[in-house]
């Protein structure tokens, strides 16, 4: 391998000749061999750095044109566009497990953009610190990159995944309207419910989760950039924070603003805790939905068997013919991961000492992982399971009419205690509720038939 010599304030460093990064990135690459190739800083963060560095150059060009010249701006902008496109991803090797401020990832961006900009300009006009990092600090750039990436992963990944599954559930509601089945509470038989009513509960959970996620976005759209090292804005020109937020908004197509209090923006990560709480709520609902689906599909002979789901692959290496609810299992594992990430994010966010939180990379990594995993799991569940759900009407009807909880319909006519006696007699003697009720002398056979209508129990207020 060929090397080039780069230098920083600590001296010279050998760097692979075919890479755009410089001395500080190489030092980090050598000093933090933790999770190499597995836990690289998320590409969403890299892309966000591309946006914010271009926005910073635009703002500096407007406020300090003698330093950020048009020539520099042009070269930097092109280099940033390449970072945004992902074509320079191979030049961002650093892992999450580095300095807690994200300084080395900020310098990775500065060095790559500077070296690429110099290559574009065909001369050395850009310095990583003096030009690419102009008016900035790692302490305000990393929080900014994290907010940009968080908004993007929610709006561009999670929201479409939610919308897709909601649309599928709406379709299933229409297809299964009026199919009455046994309700269940505590994993025990309960009064009847229609299958479309049950599905509507799933759908509404997801719609509510989207609303909660949406409520977190205004906080995430406040950017720390302009606060520099401790929130005072030292070395940034007046108005830089507003202009850079405007530039980020224009570049991303999302309505970012400058954070009203930069001291809070640097040291507190409560916005991400709040937003991830909504992601955790979505994970909890997906866990519940996946569990409902696999319970309802359990069997094929010894389970509930009330729905059919797609058979995607063999389920056992020893039991021939076995097919498992694998999409449901994947969703539940992702949900567990998200819940673990939430604990990590909450604890890391509590560790902001004085003017800076130095757990920022792990917060960013876990947040993005949660949103990405959950979005992809939901799309996979939709494509390979939800769209193929169908009701086993015969099994639903059989289970409904064998449920002792249908006795609840008799409460207004014979009272709670007599209804309980009826249920116990039916169970103990393995007879029908009608036989038990009539046998106990509570109702005549004719009156029982008049008031006992299981399907109607799912619609008590329907005329």
Specify the residue positions occupied by each region the protein language model found.
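Conserved, well-structured ligand/cofactor-binding cores
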Residues: 1-463
């Amino acid at each position: 391998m060929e090397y080039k010599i780069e230098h920083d304030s600590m001296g010279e460093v050998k760097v692979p000749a075919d890479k755009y990064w410089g001395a500080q990135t190489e030092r980090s690459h050598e000093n933090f061999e933790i999770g190499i190739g597995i836990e690289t800083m998320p590409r969403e963060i890299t892309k966000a750095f591309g946006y914010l560095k271009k926005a910073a150059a635009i703002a500096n060009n407007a406020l300090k044109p003698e330093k950020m010249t048009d020539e520099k701006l042009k070269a930097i902008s092109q280099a940033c566009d390449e970072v945004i496109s992902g074509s320079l991803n191979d030049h961002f090797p650093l892992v999450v497990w580095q300095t807690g401020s994200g300084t080395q990832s900020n310098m990775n961006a500065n060095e790559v953009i500077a070296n690429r900009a110099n290559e574009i300009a065909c001369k050395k006009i850009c310095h990583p610190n003096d030009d690419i990092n102009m008016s900035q600090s790692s302490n305000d750039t990393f929080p900014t990159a994290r907010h940009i990436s968080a908004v993007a992963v929610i709006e561009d990944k999670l929201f479409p995944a939610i919308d897709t599954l909601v649309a599928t559930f709406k379709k299933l509601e229409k297809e299964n309207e009026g199919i009455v089945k046994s309700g269940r509470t505590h994993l025990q038989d309960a009064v009847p419910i229609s299958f479309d009513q049950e599905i509507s509960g799933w759908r509404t959970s997801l719609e509510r989760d989207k609303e909660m996620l949406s409520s977190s976005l205004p906080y995430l759209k406040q950017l720390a950039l302009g606060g520099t090292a401790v929130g005072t804005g030292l070395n940034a020109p007046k108005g830089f924070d507003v202009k850079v937020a405007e530039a980020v908004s224009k570049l991303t197509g999302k309505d970012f603003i400058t954070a009203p209090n930069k001291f809070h923006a640097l040291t507190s990560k409560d916005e991400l805790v709040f937003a991830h709480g909504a992601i955790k709520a979505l994970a909890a609902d997906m866990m519940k939905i996946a569990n409902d689906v696999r319970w309802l599909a359990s069997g094929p002979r010894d389970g509930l068997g009330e729905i059919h789901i797609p058979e995607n692959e063999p389920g056992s290496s020893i039991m021939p013919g076995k097919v498992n609810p694998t999409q449901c299992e994947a969703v539940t594992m992702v949900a567990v991961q998200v819940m673990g990430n939430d604990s990590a994010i909450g604890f890391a966010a509590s560790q902001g000492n004085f003017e800076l939180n130095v757990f920022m990379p792990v917060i960013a990594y876990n947040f993005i992982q949660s949103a990405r995993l959950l979005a992809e799991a939901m799309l996979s569940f939709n494509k390979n399971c939800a769209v193929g759900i169908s009701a086993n009407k015969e099994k639903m009807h059989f289970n409904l009419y064998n449920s002792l909880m249908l006795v609840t319909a008799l409460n207004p006519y014979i009272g709670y205690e007599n209804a309980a006696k009826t249920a116990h007699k039916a169970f103990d003697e393995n007879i029908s509720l009608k036989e038990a009720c009539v046998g106990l002398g509570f109702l005549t056979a004719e009156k029982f038939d008049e008031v006992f209508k299981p399907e109607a129990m799912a619609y008590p207020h329907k005329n």
